[in-house]
């Protein structure tokens, strides 16, 4: 009987380990996810703009992080420079042409662990109808149960630089900078139903 109990305990622990090792799917939180980008304005200043999250999903495999993935959609209707006239101009046809291309999307194609909490995330960025490969320098901030929501959560940041002209958005280059510096901060959580 003792042997049977031991075997049962071993089986339970093994099953628990499998569950803990399984990839976890997080839904990104629009209230705590921001994409900020800035550029040179004739060399005098470096104004910036904010893009809010439309939708986003992160699948994180803690045991095998190279199997992780992320997908996000950023509606240009959320673009905000804090200058109303500039918001409108950036969405017009000579820039982002938001009426024709209302979304910016990113789909990861590779996650490369660099040691510690650092990762290189490569993926397909689609903007203005053009898709190009982009590499993000990502930092995993924290994984665990959020003290307020009590849900399994994840937080990360990332940076990259892109040339807007490579996406067909080359108006006023080089006076208005071609290179965009992009900074991302994000939080996600497991759906409440998935934790029950």
Regions found by a protein language model. Name each.
Residues 1-8:
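Bacterial N-terminal signal peptides that target proteins for export
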Residues 15-18:
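N-terminal signal peptide c-region/cleavage motif recognized by signal peptidases
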Residues 21-196:
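Low-complexity, acidic/polar, glycine-enriched regions of mature
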Residues 9-13:
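Hydrophobic helical h-region of N-terminal Sec-dependent signal peptides
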């Amino acid at each position: 009987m003792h042997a049977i109990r031991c075997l049962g305990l071993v089986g339970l622990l093994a099953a628990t380990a499998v569950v803990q090792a399984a990839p976890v799917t997080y839904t990104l939180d629009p209230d705590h996810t921001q994409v900020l980008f800035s550029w040179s304005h004739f060399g005098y200043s470096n104004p910036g703009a904010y893009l809010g999250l439309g939708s986003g999903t992160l699948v994180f495999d803690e045991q095998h992080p190279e199997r992780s993935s992320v997908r996000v959609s950023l509606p240009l209707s959320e673009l905000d420079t804090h200058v109303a006239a500039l918001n409108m101009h950036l969405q017009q046809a000579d820039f982002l042409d938001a009426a024709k291309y209302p979304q910016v999307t990113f789909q990861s194609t590779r996650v490369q662990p660099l040691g510690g909490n650092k990762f290189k995330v490569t993926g397909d960025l689609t903007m203005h109808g053009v898709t190009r490969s982009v590499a993000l320098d990502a930092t995993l901030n924290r994984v665990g149960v959020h003290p307020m929501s009590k849900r399994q959560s994840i937080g990360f940041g990332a940076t990259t630089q892109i040339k807007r002209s490579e996406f067909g958005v080359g108006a006023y280059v080089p006076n208005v900078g071609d290179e965009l510096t992009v900074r991302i901060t994000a939080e996600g959580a497991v759906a409440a139903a998935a934790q029950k």
